[in-house]
Structure formats: C-alpha cells, structure tokens
C-alpha cells in the first residue's frame, strides 16, 4: 500500500477557502486521514489558522505568490507551484491535491493505488478542445490555433486534435513526478497570455500528461463539493459561524463537532436561490 500525503493549497483574504480546507481535513480525518500511511500538508499564506491541526504547513510568502501567479496575472499558478513544493518536501509515495471546496465521500485509498508512473488522477474529462461547443474551450482554440510554444530546451507545443480539458479539482501523482508539474507550470506560463479563460492551469496539466504518455483517470465519483455559486453562498457562512463559535485552532473540539455542519442545502434554500437568480 502506497503512503500518501493529502495536500491542500489555500491563500487569500477570503476565510471561506481556509475554512473549506479545515472542513476537508475534519470530515476525512477519523475515517481516512489518520491512517499510518497518510499525512496532510497545507500550503497557505495564513499558517496561524492551522495551528493545532495534524498537518505540516508550508508558508506562502508574498514573493512566492507573486512569482507563481505570474505577477498577479492568474492565481491558479500558485496551486501548481504549491503542489510542486509539497511534492519536493514530502517522504510519501503519492501526493493527492484537493481544491478547498471538495471533500471525500468515499475512501480515497483505491484511487491512490491507481497512481503510478503512467497514470495520474484528475477530477473528470471535460472533452476535446478543437470543435467543442463549450464556450470556454473555444477560447483555447481561438487563442492557440496555429501557434507554437517553446517547451523545455528542445520541445515545442501546439494545440492538437487530441488536446483535452481535464478538471483539476483533484490531482493525484507520484511524489517524485516533480518534472511533470514543473512542465505543467512552464506550459501554463506560456499559454496564460494567449487564452482568455481561467482554466489554463488544468489544461496545462492535461496536456503535459498527454505529451508525456501518461493516462488520466477520473476521481469525481469519490468526491462531493460545494463549488457552485449557490452552494458557496450557503456553506461559507455556515463554516464561518462554526469557527467563530469554536475558535480557529482547537482541532479536538472541531473534530468532536464537525459532523453538525450541514453542507447540503435544504430544499427550501435551494428553491429560494433559484427563484432569486431568475428574478435578478
């Protein structure tokens, strides 16, 4: 059985992202994260918020955030470089990154065992780029078609008929595959200036793995999320109230009470949100 480090990258002024990271840890800890072969790493610019939590913390400086976001052009570069940093400093066999608005509904161990030199885990396949009806995908075709980009010292990249978009809400790799993530960040740094979309980071991971002959498996069936706007508007104040009540750093108290947090929206709330959206 592989050892695994569960990685969360969270930063910025919005507490909801940090609270989401904590909820992710709390909801999985007693079931899966406290196993002898499991560790947790949080890459954050707010290390004090994770004091007392059973994780190692890598502290993001302003300089790192600026460089990794291409001087503020696109913050998702911080996610890639944060993952790379965690991979470079872990002794676990595999590194498994989740976005802060995701949480496990099934044991992640079977997913971890599928990770190898030729297989990584991503959230889901969102389809090919060329000829897509997806408006966001079209921006890649518009921005990249008939262009070549330098990749490394002796490679070139160009959009191909096999180019696909894979979501990176989850990203599972062997911890020694640092070059894969480095390549993804290099491609991200080149493409970001040419594509008017916020998904260049995950596209870059998808493309580098394809070029490298590495297959991608979907991990979506193992996860639940609160990533939609409606869910975020419901969950964020609930988490804020929880940590206001119990404090930010009392892990044992959080662990004893986290299951009182109701992530799923009541039907009445969902209905009100839909009506409000239609009227706005």
Locations of regions flagged by a protein language model:
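N-terminal anchoring/stem segment of glycosyltransferases
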Residues: 1-69, 88-91, 267-280
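A conditional alpha-helix N-cap/helix-loop micro-motif detector
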Residues: 21, 73-76, 198
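Short, charged, surface-exposed secondary-structure boundary motifs
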Residues: 65-73, 129-136
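Glycine-rich, basic loop-to-helix element that forms the pyrophosphate-binding segment
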Residues: 68, 77-82
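GT-A fold catalytic core of metal-dependent nucleotide-sugar glycosyltransferases
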Residues: 80-134
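A short, conserved beta-to-alpha structural element at the edge of catalytic cores
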Residues: 122-147, 264
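Catalytic core and acceptor-binding pocket of nucleotide-sugar-dependent glycosyltransferases
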Residues: 151-241
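Long, low-complexity C-terminal extensions of enzymes
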Residues: 233-280
